[in-house]
Amino acid sequence: DRLDPWDERDNPYWIVNRNHMYDDIDRFNGMLSIKADIAKWWFVSYKIGIDRYTQTASNRLAANGVLKQVWQKGMMSDNTQQFRYMSHDFMSNMSHKFGDFDLNLLLGATMDETKTDRSSMMAWNFSVPDFFSYANASKDNKQFTHAATKKRLVGAFGEFRASWKNMLYLTVSGRNDWTSTLPLENRSYFYPSVSGSFVFTEALQRLGWLDDSVLNFGKLRASWAKVGKDTGVYELET
């Protein structure tokens, strides 16, 4: 019997011999990084990364199985999806010590690009059961769809860090992004942050007002940040 006697589902032998399902993914990803020392206190780097794949899937469901009513004379489908993500990152990092000050400046730029391409075909209720061909289904029993998307995000960022005598710390950062998923007048947005900290135990120990056996580390910290993010591709269209 083609049916499992205990449930409304196809017998595994029926599935193996009559239904055919295929899924394949061909994927490639990689990354290349280059770094150059301009001076002892300054280096620049560039990184490129890629992730791409093609996925194909097909289904052939035989007639008279445990299927939707409209699929009782069989169903076939073929789907292909292509995806590509590529990123570029450039950074310049400068770090130097001036007396009791440690200073660091990071500047950079990045670009991300994502592309997708999807196509889907489906046919059902064949004129000749189990003859899997799109020509074997009427116009009303076929469906073809295709969708392609492209998204690009470009960003520029910077961060300045300073410390004094391992006691006072200040960090200021900012980033501006330009995205293709927002309207032209709003596609640029900036989000900064600032933070500071004071290691009061270091100051008290330097003044001789605190024994590290009583308290060896204490820090006060305050920060403020603004967050920015774009949206998915075509999500603003109705």
Regions from the language model: what does each represent?
Residues 1-14, 59-75, 117-144, 237-238:
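Surface-exposed loop/turn segments flanking beta-strands in extracellular/periplasmic regions
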Residues 135, 185, 191-193, 235:
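Outer-membrane beta-barrel domain signature, especially the mid-to-C-terminal portions
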Residues 41, 97-103, 167, 201-218:
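Short loop/turn motifs that connect adjacent beta-strands in outer-membrane beta-barrel proteins
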Residues 12-59, 77-97, 104, 116-118, ...:
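Outer-membrane beta-barrel transmembrane strands
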Residues 43-45, 102-106, 169-171, 193, ...:
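Residue-level detector of the transmembrane beta-barrel scaffold of outer-membrane proteins
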Residues 50-66, 71, 111-126, 182-186, ...:
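Outer-membrane beta-barrel and related beta-rich outer-membrane complex signature
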Residues 89-94, 193-205:
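Short, well-ordered amphipathic alpha-helices
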